[in-house]
Amino acid sequence: MRTENTATLNLIWGALILEELARIGVQHVCMAPGSRSTPLTLAAAQQTKLKRHLHFDERGLGFMALGLAKASRAPVAIITTSGTAVANLYPAIVEAWLTHVPLIVLSGDRPPELLDCGANQAIVQPGIFAHYAKQINLPTPDAHIAPQALLTTIDEAVANQTRPVHINCMYREPLYPSELGVPILDTESPYLKPLQTWLQLSRPYTQYGKYKQVSNPSDDAIMRFVHGKGVIVAGTLTPEQDPQQLIALSQKIGWPLLTDAQSQLRQHPAAIGNIDQLLQHPKARNLLQEADRVLVFGGRLLSKRLISYLAEQHWHSYWQVLPEQNRLDPSHNAKHVWHANAAQFAALNWYRSSSANWANTLITYNDELHNLFVRNIDHGEFGEAQVVRAIANTRPLEQQLFIGNSLPVRLYDMYAPVSCCTATTYTNRGASGIDGLLATACGLAAHEGKPTSLIIGDLSQLHDLNSLAIAKSLASPLVIVILNNDGGNIFNLLPVPNEQVRNDYYRLSHGLEFGYAAAMFNLPYNQVDNLADFQDSYNEALDFQGASIIEVNVSQTQASDQIAELNLWVKQS
């Protein structure tokens, strides 16, 4: 009787946790198979308010949850068993912490008496994510602990969290009930009697108000700030911040808007999108050096040239707007940081600058670069930048775009085309790893249900190869565009002192192609070596209800040679 009560109470605790998370706003739960997490798994299987996603690899599962959370703008739960299964979530948790994405890890664990004694699959799990997650340690389910205490623990742990939370759940055996019939929380268990009112409602047990510290400048401070030559910089901005409002702000003040690849504004015709290249354009750089005020929205800028410009310029006033308490300035400039949503800050009572339109010549220089890229990239040899520009120009309102790290995101930042409308753009630029990129894109696609394009390098795809199993399960279009230059050829752009050392220790040429990987997971596959074939394959893939792969094969030096050629032209302008 006692062991059956243990299994039932385990299950009730699991069900209470999942029910409360659903009421708090969790829409998705990502699950990996395992025995010690059985009370959570069985509870999730019965939970009708959550959409379930399953994958055998916890590393990919964590990144899929990251993509789901980015797309849904809501926390996502992850269920794993004990041991190294939990540790495999670490890369995704780090990325989520750095970029303020809320993930909730529910890890099954052994009870205290089975730790540090040689028991199977038992490690010390509390604190495994160091300072990259808020830590909550639940005891083993106990009838002497009121269910209200469990609910308030969950509520406090998750309320107003914009970063990962790790809830470690210890369970004693038996883990499996003798039968699983009616919904767990519909039982006549005396343990649930104190929750009868809560069970009849749909709201969380404890409702926390939204806590958001907002700081705004006074009208007088704004008037003084705009009295001079300034620039506005759009860094990493999420879609819910409504970055489009920065266009109107730029036009109202009369200062140029310099846009990063992650700003949602990189391709906007009213922005100075080619800022990375303009900073090596002699006339443009000389003009930009006249600025003495800067208004930065967001952080995590991609362009080293833009970062250097912000570091080297002597600013009279430096303002940065961030939605969360954070330090996002590797140059450590003296500044005033305002805590606000970008759109809300842009809607303040701004005045026309006394030096409005001081940098209008930048528009001419920006247009010159646009024409250069059309001639030399769009109508030049087939290559990586040409493919990136083609993707960015194709049906942008119909799809969302996830750009992989290393060379792909830099090509987009340097050469993205001007467009009247752009796709919602996502990246993983917190820790900027090349792991989990496909899995993240799968999470984006799984939530939105709209066409999603992933631009990914060959090493990044090899790193996340088994996430093709997640891609295979998708019902909406996911176009996986692999830029295969046979290794880590971003190192062609870095000052490695010896070519042999570059190839042996950095580039790691592999000679692999992805046709057999596509066949293994039964995914449509095309290999292309010219723009016309790519565009045909790409448009077809956007209409396919599921994942497909397009492999773009180029030489190891195609992109780096083209970058060097374009840099030379820009510097001589």
From Swiss-Prot:
Enzyme Commission no: 2.2.1.9
Cofactor note as given: Binds 1 thiamine pyrophosphate per subunit.
Record GO terms (molecular function): 2-succinyl-5-enolpyruvyl-6-hydroxy-3-cyclohexene-1-carboxylic-acid synthase activity; magnesium ion binding; manganese ion binding; thiamine pyrophosphate binding
Listed GO biological process terms: menaquinone biosynthetic process
Catalytic reaction(s) noted: isochorismate + 2-oxoglutarate + H(+) = 5-enolpyruvoyl-6-hydroxy-2-succinyl-cyclohex-3-ene-1-carboxylate + CO2
UniProt KW keywords: Magnesium, Manganese, Menaquinone biosynthesis, Metal-binding, Thiamine pyrophosphate, Transferase
Family: Belongs to the TPP enzyme family. MenD subfamily.
Alphabetical list of HAMAP family matching this protein: MenD
Protein name: 2-succinyl-5-enolpyruvyl-6-hydroxy-3-cyclohexene-1-carboxylate synthase
Species per Swiss-Prot/TrEMBL record: Shewanella putrefaciens (strain CN-32 / ATCC BAA-453)
